[in-house]
UniProtKB/Swiss-Prot annotation:
Cited CDD domains: uS7_Bacteria (cd14869)
Function: One of the primary rRNA binding proteins, it binds directly to 16S rRNA where it nucleates assembly of the head domain of the 30S subunit. Is located at the subunit interface close to the decoding center, probably blocks exit of the E-site tRNA.
Name of the featured protein: Small ribosomal subunit protein uS7
Gene behind the chain: rpsG
Organism: Petrotoga mobilis (strain DSM 10674 / SJ95)
Keywords attached to this entry: Ribonucleoprotein, Ribosomal protein, RNA-binding, rRNA-binding, tRNA-binding
GO CC list: small ribosomal subunit
Length: 155
């Protein structure tokens, strides 16, 4: 049997911009507890994003995240001995965390020297609705669209 659901932890906003989403992004990028290094990388990438977009860095960052957020995704559902990929709507908090994860992993998988340039390029691509993280979102949407016939298994 399931126990009670875990309580949501309140996340401290980041020190410079006072933004909770940016704090989540920094925490996702952090390796081995090196938060100050992750903050330096993210803040430098945001400066480059602001230069490229000629916009407030936080607004540009939020727009980049919104462009990567998925609306629907598929989940495996076993019905009568066969497994179907059933499309489900994605809750807001899961959509945000998926978008952050996709941006960070696609920036990490880029070939290049420093993480600042890779991350800033990925954020610029996400802002302009291009790049691997947006492609990942479109692939997820395409899978959900292809399996729309199984949407009635969504009980």
């Amino acid at each position: 049997m399931r126990r009670r659901t875990a309580e949501k932890r309140n996340i401290v906003p980041d020190p410079i911009y006072g933004d909770i989403l940016l704090s989540k992004f920094i925490n996702r990028l952090m390796y081995d507890g090196k938060k100050s290094l992750a903050q330096q990388i993210v803040y430098s990438a945001l400066e480059r994003l602001a230069e490229a977009t000629k916009e407030n860095p936080i607004e540009a960052f939020h727009k980049a995240i919104d462009n990567v957020k998925p609306v629907v995704e598929v989940r495996s559902r076993r019905v009568g001995g066969s497994t179907y990929q059933v499309p489900f709507e994605v809750p807001e908090n899961r959509a945000t965390s998926l978008a952050i994860r996709w941006i960070v992993t696609s920036a990490q998988s880029k070939k290049g020297r420093d993480m600042v340039s890779k991350l800033s390029q990925e954020l610029i691509d996400a802002y302009n609705n291009t790049g691997p993280s947006v492609k990942k979102k479109e692939d997820v949407h395409r899978m959900a669209e292809a399996n729309r016939a199984f949407a009635h298994f969504r009980w």
